[in-house]
Amino acid sequence: MDFEFSEDQATLRDSLRRLVTHEYTLERRQAFLATPHGSSPRMWGLLAQQGVFSLGLPESVGGYGGPQEIMLVMEELGRGLVLEPFLSTVVLGGGLIRDHGTVAQRARLLPKIATGELRIVLAHFETGARYVLDHVSSIARRGRGSYVLTGSKVLVLDAPLADLLIVSARDDAAGGLSLFLVAPNTPGVTTTPYRTQDGRSAADVVLDEVRLPTAARLGSPGVALTALEQAVDCSFAALCAEAVGVIEALNEITLHHLNTRKLGQSGGRFQLMVLMATQAKSMSYLATSRCRARDRSERRRILSAAQAFVGKVARFVGQQAMQLHGGVGTSTEVAVSHYCKRLAMINASFGDSDHRVGAFGDLLRAES
């Protein structure tokens, strides 16, 4: 793998780090969390000015870059514990529209994502799914010139911030999964917002006889599972990169604490934290290099292994950082507790490290 960053990539990373360092002090982040939806419209606008919402999108709509640039952005957002829905909008939402949308849908929606005008969120997982992507009981009944959606979705991350939802449902006519573009204020849509462990916005979504025009269906009917798998795989890689950013920041905070308190006897434990962070970064790079591979089996195997390893490193580093800080580490007034909470949430996203180990084993057995 060649991960020597180009001048443009280094400039992107450095400018974003300066922005996050200046805008996302712990005090400001706490203030953002205290707002109704736990976000900063100003920060969203500043990220748009940086051009990061164009990453991975086609050049025809002003897009540039790809997985490697997204990795750099996710690392920096992780370092600052940035709350804005970059992953939901760019990696998941933008990826689904890019890969599965019609020409007209791509032309209409992708430019709005690129400028930050549109925040789009995937509403897919349901009760009892256990991270299985084709476990969908929501139904889309096709009528004359319309669809009627019925069902419910749980833990829809960033839903309270969304301008548009991408909702999955089983197409009664086509037989497979279809995706639908649904405005949150559509009659029959009910959202119940709440906060996750790390303070981020999420919601459960109920669809009660939601009537949509046929044009609201994203792409072709009944064949959305492949696009969902690809988008989620890219999200695996992006979350690995975010975890690396969180881990590196947590190590820096821990080193400062050890030096300030002159806790030299803990140096061995800290060196192990640094070593494991380096290994996690290597696995993040591997995930980034394979997240859009055409060979589905190879892609899923590598991404499962990468996420499992990074998740275990995240758990270890978080535990060690908390122990080395002592009781003060549990306080919401110090940064370490917020970094540890974010690592826990990343590890639980789309399947925790134990689930990914099982998935990796299943893939190996299937190939043997």
Range-by-range predicted roles:
Residues 1-81, 100-103, 112, 116, ...:
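Alpha-helical interface subdomain recognition
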Residues 66, 132-134, 158-162:
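Short glycine/proline-enriched turns and hinge-like loops at secondary-structure junctions
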Residues 84-104:
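N-terminal glycine-rich flavin-associated loop
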